[in-house]
């Protein structure tokens, strides 16, 4: 190997090495494009890598795209500090790519794409590269970060691919492993991209590259690059034509991470390319399989009288408290003397109050009293395991799928109070045993005089009168022993449950909400809302047409395209509710949404049920919230803070720690909406990452969030968790872009009011 020969001057060295450096540094972006980049360390990916994709964006070339009109190889070198900053950024990227290579991940070799039919096409994997190449790359990164190796005197805002280039000697030959040979782009294209961002017009200076002769140990079939001279012409149009969609998208994010607000215009011109929306369709002749998940039969419920008086309900909670205390004492005794299952066994909760026996007690009590207590349990059941302890989550999941039903005597009394002694004469047939039980009522099948099949929801007695006391009693009992974790926002859950239950107990209000939703989705072929039967509905009984189906969370075994369809429609519905209609059904309990059959045509539909928790949102609130989401979509942290203060998330007096945590949480939630290609929820970790920020926000928050946020974010969380449960792929970014493109700010006078 030839000895190192230092260059005659920094400028001369930079001119000589421009081509290899462009090639070399280039592949960082490709190595991170798509889904494979997400498997690398999150900190490097979100911090160093988002900056390295700009290849020295610390110089901010995009902020003043016409600032430089000199030839590509300017005789003026950047300042030492500027060059050092760029060197550190590039070094971070090289280090990241070295780690990719060590795992056998190369540009385009991992991840998958989604076809319009929902088919996932996986790329081939390769074996890890030789360790000495990785070591050389790491050493190069170290030298660059310390300024030992200089960079070219111009910014590298576009870097499309990175090979295994190693600068060990200024005259060394570049070795290329066979598996990377096809990944090296033409140097002319790289120069064109650089010139486009710099705003330089006219032909690029000729660049000659001399052969390099370095041979690394362990690398065979190396390719020798022959000397070549490239001439390129730079167009004045945006550089989007020479970038892939993913590269341009990633480039914009990186520019904004260093507060460059002009990147989007520089890349796309005045018109940004519209993201292509993946709209999966159900397979031809698809039939809804009702054998699994059909809720039109009760398999886990028992008949039991509902405690109708406050004293009776209080006594039930008192029995639960004593039972939990005794169960916890017995569990501690068993653990102390090593009786039964060992604590170390998988699935055994550490908290003795969450023993198996106590779990049975909680489920039995909530299923018996129903009402507010059961509602709170159902709300908690849809939370993520990073927020609610798994053992408690299992308890509430059992609660969500189970509820005792009223004896026939109580059912008849409720129907008599609503429609008089001759209530049965209004039906051709009424099934005394319910086919579904919910938190505040149970549902019976019936047939009208005209032959229509209907569902009759009958409210449990005493529920409306005992809302506040039921919730207080349940929270008091379960708070013993520290069952609820800190930072779970229990107060928020309780507040929402109180308000929603008082609204849900008014079936006349729910009927109005149901009719309004039928109007809103009238032209939407994929969604259906059952018709309300007014003459057989009251404040405590609600009758609607009967629709057969199964809850969406019971569709986990459906084909991928069906799961994508369900999750996609659910998220699209949520976006329309808040931004288009400003009227939302805020209870994301998955049992309220069916994959069902149209009652007349039998065609598959996403069926919406239970509108008791429906509410409207003011235009001013939605306008500001839209600005926050769009700022997250754009990666604009300054705007997120500005609009968060305006809406009431922040006061303006928070510490930088609180502001950073808040912005980070918004950016995390906005990741799905910021992606211009389908988002794979199978690998999402949004809730886990936000959970890590909660302690900081709890400690430093100066004001509670706006009242509207609690119900809105609960619905959004339900959408995300459903998509994750179904392991679906959804074009969240494309759907949001469509909504935002047609959104009109300012009062429009069309607020919906059902109260």
UniProtKB/Swiss-Prot annotation:
Domain of life: Eukaryota
GO (cellular component) term, any one: mitochondrion
Keywords associated with the record: ATP-binding, Kinase, Mitochondrion, Nucleotide-binding, Transferase, Transit peptide, Ubiquinone biosynthesis
Subcellular location as annotated: Mitochondrion
Residues the record lists as binding ATP: 435-443, 457
Gene Ontology biological-process annotations: ubiquinone biosynthetic process
Pathway noted in the entry: Cofactor biosynthesis; ubiquinone biosynthesis
EC number: 2.7.-.-
Active site: 587 (proton acceptor)
Pfam families: ABC1
Signal peptide: none
Biological role: Atypical kinase involved in the biosynthesis of coenzyme Q, also named ubiquinone, an essential lipid-soluble electron transporter for aerobic cellular respiration. Its substrate specificity is still unclear: may act as a protein kinase that mediates phosphorylation of coq-3. According to other reports, acts as a small molecule kinase, possibly a lipid kinase that phosphorylates a prenyl lipid in the ubiquinone biosynthesis pathway, as suggested by its ability to bind coenzyme Q lipid intermediates.
Family: Belongs to the protein kinase superfamily. ADCK protein kinase family.
PANTHER family: COENZYME Q8, PTHR43851
Name of this chain's protein: Atypical kinase coq-8, mitochondrial
